[in-house]
Amino acid sequence: MLRDPTTTGWPPLLLLLLQLPPPPLVCGAPAGPGTGAQASELVVPTRLPGSASELAFHLSAFGQGFVLRLAPDASFLAPEFKIERLGGSSAAAGGEPGLRGCFFSGTVNGERESLAAMSCVAGWSGSFLLAGEEFTIQPQGAGDSLDQPHRLQRWGPGQRREDPGLAAAEVFPLPQGLEWEVEMGNGQGQERSDNEEDRKQDKEGLLKETEDSRKVPPPFGSKTRSKRFVSEARFVETLLVADASMAAFYGTDLQNHILTVMSMAARIYKHPSIRNSVNLVVVKVLIVEKERWGPEVSDNGGLTLRNFCSWQRRFNKPSDRHPEHYDTAILFTRQNFCGKGEQCDTLGMADVGTICDPDKSCSVIKDEGLQAAYTLAHELGHVLSMPHDDSKPCVRLFGPMGKYHMMAPFFIHVNKTLPWSPCSAVYLTELLDDGHGDCLLDAPTSVLPLPTGLPGHSTLYELDQQCKQIFGPDFRHCPNTSVEDICVQLCARHRDSDEPICHTKNGSLLWADGTPCGPGHLCLDGSCVLKEDVENPKAVVDGDWGPWRPWGQCSRTCGGGIQFSNRECDNPMPQNGGRFCLGERVKYQSCNTEECPPNGKSFREQQCEKYNAYNHTDLDGNFLQWVPKYSGVSPRDRCKLFCRARGRSEFKVFEAKVIDGTLCGPDTLSICVRGQCVKAGCDHVVNSPKKLDKCGVCGGKGTACRKISGSFTPFSYGYNDIVTIPAGATNIDVKQRSHPGVRNDGSYLALKTANGQYLLNGNLAISAIEQDILVKGTILKYSGSMATLERLQSFQALPEPLTVQLLTVSGEVFPPKVRYTFFVPNDMDFSVQNSKERATTNIIQSLPSAEWVLGDWSECPSTCRGSWQRRTVECRDPSGQASDTCDEALKPEDAKPCGSQPCPL
């Protein structure tokens, strides 16, 4: 969200305004005319005969002739692009084929390397490239006829030198600029909230999450996953919506305006500093002509965003393959709306990282003329998961990055040579590499070309019109603009004011590129440039990959680590809208694959232990001991560092990604690489086909062990020994199935060590939910007593002998039966008779009192005010049966708010 700057510390003539209507402000003294040769001529195109599907005409200027041969080309729009009007005299939705027929492209003088693009929207205008020179053509009258006078201008890149007849344009430093706000951000926009940092997968520090929270939805309608670490062309198919306030303000120029704004934003996303190939495509435009037909828009920015997100869903097609399906929706409005703290100078609102979520991939833009293009690019950046440049994760990774990138929290002006910060590029790349942007892979049959004409050439963006769009319909350009403010600061004066006082705001509202700034001069990027200084067009340069860099450091010293090599799209770097490199940008390989010395701890366990003295204590002040948590973790979250407090149900996510080379789980050989599971062999090599056989031998044939199996039916109350599984046993599987219709049969699996210490369901305390049992680095997975099939499993070699028991606390007509299997080495002296049916009958003591059993927190619908997380809190006795004897005063909470604030961008 953007906010107007304060006036602190400014000299009287340069004070900036907080709000409109602003107090009087003198922009400066009258500016003198610029100097320089004229690089344009008035021409009248001559229509040439041709086919019905071809437009051909001749121009004479600059001592040469130009013959343009053009064919209809609507690739600026998606193939099924439509404009629909809601609520007006044409309330019924319908396409506008006439608009599609107004775009043409072709060649000049028959040259294969030439390029021409023309539009008949609001008169014939466009541009063409020939022999290294760029030309733009604009009508000089109000009609649509081709044979009226047009101004032909010659352009080129060159050095942008200041007008020698004018003082150099100066951009003054601002105490603060306009502020962006982001959903899940704080009211000041200067740093993101804890919740927002959690969502963005903070690189260090504690992440407090619930089991199911923070899950990014799967790509909507996506059938296949993109390859990781591969640069692929992405297409952001977009719905543009203009509300009734936009229709009233722009009238018949509305569709031209929002397409111009969109094309400017698309150009920003083409810059190589974003380090990805991102193409913006317009699928549909909805123009709301009657307020009641559109989304509810108010001065509450957060509520407006929620309303629009809900409203836009009705127009989206479910299938990503449908030509009218869009990936994100954008609302343009002239309505002022507020963020937090009664600050009503917000320019944009959006949710973070929601691009493939059809319910939340949306943003709201406050229209202020062409400045809306930067707001749109910023808000869409948040939807693509980019945080603010001054957020804690960005600062930790890259240090302070200045205030002039696209994702700066305050909008002053954008560094057009480097619009995207390194942090923005990294977060976007991670989103795409993690598969959360796969909905952007489907390409329309035609892509969106960027218009080459500068907006300042159009009558829609004359200086007076620019002032009206930003300050209001009663304002016009200030005639006494100072030399210092030309092209740099847009100043306006109320048309009914008798005082020669001009107003400005926002710190540095540049004049639109192409705006005349003196005889023979035009504005370009805030500078008044001689037309003849830009004689040759900037050649489009496609990017190409540089060499692979040396392999980096291995992530582990033993047990199978990962090392990376990468290459950059810098040989050459894309320039002037050239294509970003496609293909593999990062490769990795296994390293240090030798086995680690046995220490009784898994690599994931060592990572959890790091937080044992991390200021985490229980209610008595004792430090908690953290062990890995596997049970209840979603498969897509297996590479997050979930840790559980030993002996407790509390767990936390300490890291968004475990160290590369960590096993994804106790029951798989796959390993984590940058937060994603990849296949690996038992030799710790990525993509290796080697597997553990049933004996636990890597690459073995299963001949080094024998199977031990049996069954057991309890015959007495209490704890009954079933079998003692020896150290070294592998592929352990113990099952106790309840009878049909009987969930709690009064019999429960138990597990104890050789010294009599219970690891599971001991002392008549029953674990009702799934859990992990850690035994010297080996994990045994327990299903929980509430499961219909109560099960105890381990795929790793058992480090010490364990005794499996069955606790029986009630009689059954059909007593349950326990079955078990495991494998032991052939040379192990093991006898089932010696290990089972020792049947020590334990006297059942009086059952302890019932206790509260806690479920896992549900997923947060959002982190904004009004949404709640919930969990089950049930009173159960040791047998797992529901009870009413728990102390209500000690009942834990079963609901908590997800957030207490609206979430601005």
UniProtKB/Swiss-Prot annotation:
Domain notes: The spacer domain and the TSP type-1 domains are important for a tight interaction with the extracellular matrix.
Gene3D superfamilies registered for this protein in UniProt: 2.60.120.830, 3.40.1620.60, Collagenase (Catalytic Domain), Thrombospondin type-1 (TSP1) repeat
UniProt cross-references to SUPFAM superfamilies, sorted A to Z: Metalloproteases ('zincins'), catalytic domain (SSF55486), TSP-1 type 1 repeat (SSF82895)
Reported cofactor(s): Zn(2+)
Source organism of this protein record: Mus musculus
Glycosylation site positions: 415, 480, 506, 615
Main location: secreted
Cofactor comment: Binds 1 zinc ion per subunit.
Span of domain Peptidase M12B: 234-444
S-S bonds: 309-362, 338-344, 356-439, 394-423, 478-502, 487-523, 517-528, 554-591, 558-596, 569-581
Tissue: Expressed specifically in adult lung and heart and low expression during mouse development.
EC number: 3.4.24.-
Entry annotated with the keyword Signal: yes
Alphabetized PANTHER family for the sequence: A DISINTEGRIN AND METALLOPROTEINASE WITH THROMBOSPONDIN MOTIFS 8, ADAMTS A DISINTEGRIN AND METALLOPROTEASE WITH THROMBOSPONDIN MOTIFS PROTEASE
Any one biological process term the GO annotation gives: extracellular matrix organization
Name assigned to this protein: A disintegrin and metalloproteinase with thrombospondin motifs 8
Keyword set includes Metal-binding: yes
GO cellular component: extracellular region
This protein's encoding gene: Adamts8
